[in-house]
Structure formats: structure tokens, C-alpha cells
Amino acid sequence: MFRPKKIVIIGGGLAGLTSAILLQQGGFNVTLFEKKRYPFNRVCGEYISNEALPFLQSLDLKLSELGPSKINRLSVTTERGKELTADLPLGGFGLSRYMLDNLLFEYAEKLGVEFLFEKVNDIQFRENIFEITSANGIHQSPLAIAAYGKRSNLDQKFKRSFFYNRSPYMGVKYHILTDLPNNLIRLDNFNGGYSGVCKIENQKFNLCYLSKTANLKKYHGISEMEENVLHKNPFLKHLFKNSDFLNGKPEVINEISFEPKSLIEDHLLFCGDSAGMITPLCGNGMAIAIHSAKILSQIIIRHAKAHTLDRDALEREYFSKWTNEFSLRLRSGRFIQHLFGNPLITEVAVAVLGNLPALNQMIVKKTHGKVF
């Protein structure tokens, strides 16, 4: 059997934490680097498609004790006040990353995963070993996973092509108290972006929107942009005017890229948003992060049973399975995003989809996977 069974994971989001849990259970000694200490908030829509629910339940995480919402209805609104509603056959649940990530962290820590709350500054692959450099020293491992999310200084070090193409998108997230149906996720369109709102735990709602950064450049700050751009959608204006905003300032992230990304760089295996990000309106980025971690972890565990590690075979299998499972869904998400954020196109799309419910359901299926 391949020895030593050690692996380092950079990034403690859903993909990193899921990988850590499965690999530790699979006999690896796992070290995970994360810049922040749990629990903390992230920019995220916090809606998880039920395609991930059986897997999470198989870990015996006791998710129900956190009080997630159950969501089975979708609403899409336009600046002119039109609304499209539809059932979500598979459905999903709402739960904050503050709660979910912390639950996974505590579970992983009990399994014996080593957590180092440090920023990784460099990764080098030399003589069949990864050297991971942080502020506190150099760590070595025969295997390493990059699960550090949407964008990192490490992307520049690996000269990943998407890093050099400036992305026009920014993300903003609030937690609010408001009066909306508990089983609804609503997408509100505005010029240059769209917003999603859904219930999470403890009577709170997640309000998260994606906007072109050009919107912000026209105004003096986020609140002024919201007043002049987002509020042109009457549904959004009512939401902002009739909700209690929690936690003070919003969480903000810039340079969100939906371009295709490489899965492997110099034998470093990318997972979750680091490997490719589906557009938020598809509503299953969290499920994809978890699923991709499951796929990669199972492949690593299986290949580790060999007497010697065949990196090329491992990487080929991961590339093939990831591509078959996610490539079309991410491509469909990029296409569908073109229907949103442009007021005229959005009005037409909502009108057409409202009259063709079968097409509406087909689009949902194109961006969602099967239960895993």
C-alpha cells in the first residue's frame, strides 16, 4: 500500500472540509489550512440543493438540529414587476455557512483532522513531494488539494489563465429578518445583476446578490448603488425597505469569475470553486462543492491502495469524472446567466418561461444533478 498516507488541503470551505472528513475516514492523516477561525460568514447564497442531502445525512451530522429551512418553490422577478413562479421538484434547504461550515469543522476535528489557521503563501512540487509554505514554516506532503475557493494569490503563482482576465462581478451578502414564505427562494433581477433571497436558520433570511462592478463605480458606496440600481426592481425595493438588516456591514467579495478553470496544476488537485464555479442563479454551487470533494476523495482513497502512487492515472480519472459530472452544468449556468441582469432580455425570458412551464423545468434539470 502507498505510504505515507498524508495529505494537505488548502482551504476550509465546503469542498475542503468534505475532503478532509472523507480522507481522514479513509485512513489518511489530513492537515487542512484555513486563514480564518470557525465560525465565520462567507459570501454565499446559502441554499443547498437536496442532491447533497443524502450524502450529508450519511455522515450523521445531525443537520436538523441546526434548524435549516425546507425550500421547494422558486420565484423570479423583473424590474417591471413581473414574477415567474415554479416548483423545485428536488428542492433544497437553507442554512448559513456560519453554521454549516462550523458543523463540518467540528466533525472533522473529532475525526483527527489537523487544522492550521494560517495563510498559505506558496506551493511547490519538488522530487515527488509538495512543499506548502505558510507564515509559520514549510510543510511537506506527497498529495495536496487546493480548495481555497473562488480566487486566491495562489492562482497567480500557478499562472491560472482566469486570474489575468478581470472579472466584472462582485458579490454582496446580508442576513436579514423579513416576511417571506419559508419555502421560497426568490431571484430578483436588476440592471447588471440579480439577487437571491431565501430563509436559513433561526428565522433569518439570506440576501445575496451578484452585480457588475460597473454599477458600484457609478456611486459612492454599496448603499447608494443599492438605492439607485437594485431598488428599480419593486420586489427588491420592498425587501430592502421592509427588512431588518443584521450583522452591520455586508460581506463583500470582488473579482468573481465563472470562466473554466484547470483541475490540475503541477499535480496539485483543484476542488470546489477552485476547480470551477457555477453561476449563483443555478442555486447548487454548494452541492457541487460537496459532490466534487466526494468524487476526488474516493478516487484518492482507491489509488492509495496501490503499492505505488500513479499520479497520472489518478489525475486522468479525476479529470474524466469531474468533466462528466459538472462540465455541462457549469456551461449551462454560464449560458443561463446571459438571460439575467439585462432588463430587456430578462423581461422576455420571464414572459416566455411563464408560458412554457416544461421549458422552465428543463432548465432547472440542466443545471442540477442527481442525488449523490
Put a short name on every predicted segment.
Residues Q298-F372:
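C-terminal helical "tail/cap" subdomain of flavin- and related membrane-associated enzymes
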Residues F2-G13:
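Beta1/beta-strand and adjacent pyrophosphate-binding region of the FAD-binding site
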Residues D122, I138, K217, G221-I299, ...:
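FAD/FMN-dependent oxidoreductases across multiple families
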Residues Y107-L236:
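Predominantly flavin-linked oxidoreductase catalytic cores and closely associated redox partners
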Residues I10, Q24-C44:
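Glycine-rich FAD pyrophosphate-binding loop
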Residues G16-L17:
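N-terminal Rossmann-fold NAD(P) dinucleotide-binding loop
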Residues A52-L103:
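A conserved beta-strand/loop capping segment in the N-terminal third of enzymes
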